[in-house]
Amino acid sequence: MKVGVVGASGYVGGETLRLLVNHPNVEITMVTSRQHVGEYLHRVQPSLKGFTDLTFSELDYDKLTDKCDLVFTAVPHGTATEIVKALYDRGIKIIDLSADYRLHDQDAYDKWYGWEHPHPDYLNKSVFGVPELHREEIKKAQLVSCPGCMAVTSMLALAPLIRNNIIDTDHIVVDSKIGSSGAGSGSGTAHAMRAGVIRPYKPAKHRHTGEIEQELSEIAGKKIHVSMSPHAVDVVRGILCTNHTFMQKDMEEKELWKLYRQTYGEEKFVRLIRDKKGLYKFPDPKFLVGSNFCDIGFDLDEDNNRLIALSASDNLMKGAAGSAIQNMNVMCGFDEMDGLRYTPLTPV
C-alpha cells in the first residue's frame, strides 16, 4: 500500500516514518514539509539515513491523490482542518495526528480550543482512533483521528471502571506527567530552564480533558466531567497518568484484576502490571520507550474508598505515531502488530 506523510519534519512525523520504513505492507511515496522542500528526508530526520532517499515535496493534493492510498497528517493543530477536508473529498483514507477532528461537537472546540471549527459537518465523519475502544468503527472509516497522548493513556485505565459502574463518575482526577517531546520539536525553553523540572502546565482546562470526557461519557451513556492536571518532567519520552477515582461498589483486588483481564486480555498493546517483586510493581514509562504498549495497574486505598488506576505509555508511540500505525493496520486489514513489533528500549 502506498502512503504519504504530510508534515514529516517534526517529532510525530519522524516517528511515524520510523515505523513506516519497517512496515512489511507499506511503501512511502510522498512526504511534505513547507520549510524543507527539496531537501533529503534524512537531513531533517537523521535516524532515517540509509532507509530512504525521499526528498520533501510541497503540499499538492493532486499529487497526493495520484501517489497515495492513505495519508497521515502530522501538522500543527488548526492546520489540518483544510488538508483533511481536501483529502477526504478526494476519497483518500486519512489518519490525522492533529487535534482538529478528535472532538465530535462544535461546542467542544469552542470550549477546549477557543476557536470555531471551519468544517463542523466533517466532525462526525471522523472516528476516534483508539482500536481498544472503537475497532469495528475504525475498520470501516475513511478518516481516523488519533487521540491525544495523555487522553489515550488515561482513558484506557478508566474505561473498564466506567463501563462496569465501579467508580463515582462525578469525582475523577487525572494527574499526568509527560516528557519534553510532548511539546513538539519547535524552539522552546532553554535547556537550563527545562532540565530537572517537575513543572505544572495548564493545571486546569487542559484540552486533552475534552477527549477524555467525550469518550468516557459515550461509554457511560451520560455526561462525565474529569479534572486533569498535567506536569512537564525531566524525561524526553513518556507519560504516567495517576487516575484518582472513588469506588461506588465494594470489590476486592482480585475482582478488579479479573475485570481488567476480561477487558484487555486479548489486546496486543495493553499490558497489565501487577508484580509483587522487582522494580516494575506499577506502570512506569521508563520501561515503555520506543514501544506501542500502554501499561495499566492500580492500587487500593481502602481507608478512603479510593481506587488509583495507573497507566503509562510512550507519548510518541501509543500517544501518537504508534497509534497511527495501529489504526492504519485496522483500517486496511493488516495484522494489528505489523510495523509495531518493538520491545521497549532499556536502559534509556
Swiss-Prot record:
It is found in: Cytoplasm. Its EC number is 1.2.1.103, 1.2.1.106. NADP(+) binds at S9, G10, Y11, V12, N315. Gene3D superfamilies: Dihydrodipicolinate Reductase, domain 2 (3.30.360.10), NAD(P)-binding Rossmann-like Domain (3.40.50.720). The keyword Transferase does not apply. Pathway: Amino-acid biosynthesis; L-lysine biosynthesis via AAA pathway; L-lysine from L-alpha-aminoadipate (Thermus route): step 3/5; Amino-acid biosynthesis; L-arginine biosynthesis. GO terms for cellular component: cytoplasm. Transmembrane segments: none annotated. It catalyses: [amino-group carrier protein]-C-terminal-N-(1-carboxy-5-oxopentan-1-yl)-L-glutamine + phosphate + NADP(+) = [amino-group carrier protein]-C-terminal-N-(1-carboxy-5-phosphooxy-5-oxopentan-1-yl)-L-glutamine + NADPH + H(+); [amino-group carrier protein]-C-terminal-gamma-(L-glutamyl-5-semialdehyde)-L-glutamate + phosphate + NADP(+) = [amino-group carrier protein]-C-terminal-gamma-(5-phospho-L-glutamyl)-L-glutamate + NADPH + H(+). The active site is at C149. GO terms for biological process: arginine biosynthetic process via ornithine; L-arginine biosynthetic process; lysine biosynthetic process via aminoadipic acid. GO terms for molecular function: N-acetyl-gamma-aminoadipyl-phosphate reductase activity; N-acetyl-gamma-glutamyl-phosphate reductase activity; NAD binding; NADP+ binding. SMART domains: Semialdhyde_dh (SM00859). InterPro entries: AGPR_type-1, LysY, NAD(P)-bd_dom_sf, NAGSA_dehydrogenase, Semialdehyde_DH_NAD-bd. Keywords: Amino-acid biosynthesis, Arginine biosynthesis, Cytoplasm, Lysine biosynthesis, NADP, Oxidoreductase. Pfam families: Semialdhyde_dh (PF01118), Semialdhyde_dhC_1 (PF22698). PANTHER family: [LYSW]-L-2-AMINOADIPATE_[LYSW]-L-GLUTAMATE PHOSPHATE REDUCTASE-RELATED, N-ACETYL-GAMMA-GLUTAMYL-PHOSPHATE REDUCTASE, CHLOROPLASTIC-RELATED-RELATED. Involved in both the arginine and lysine biosynthetic pathways. HAMAP family: ArgC_type1 (MF_00150), LysY (MF_02083). NCBIfam families: argC. Belongs to the NAGSA dehydrogenase family. Type 1 subfamily. LysY sub-subfamily. This is Putative [LysW]-L-2-aminoadipate/[LysW]-L-glutamate phosphate reductase. The lineage of its organism: Archaea, Nitrososphaerota, Nitrososphaeria, Nitrosopumilales, Nitrosopumilaceae. The gene is lysY.
